[in-house]
Amino acid sequence: MEQRYLEALEEEKILSTKIMELKNLEKKVNEETGEEYGSYLYSTKINLLELKLNKVKREIKDWEGF
């Protein structure tokens, strides 16, 4: 079970990185187009990854509670 804790920590890092990259892409596209086109393209994916990240963070918190 400790293996899952380590996997969750790694997954948290990966998800955080992906979210940050997508937010940067979103900002770049918005600046290039002068519109909210980047938000249109990336907001759903970012939201889904943030939900998954929150789930992983809760799992990590549960593990740290033991």
Predicted regions and their residues:
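Short, charge/polar-rich alpha-helical segments
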Residues: M1-T17, S43
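Charged, low-complexity interaction regions
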Residues: K28-S39
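Amphipathic alpha-helical coiled-coil segments
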Residues: K18-L22, T44-F66
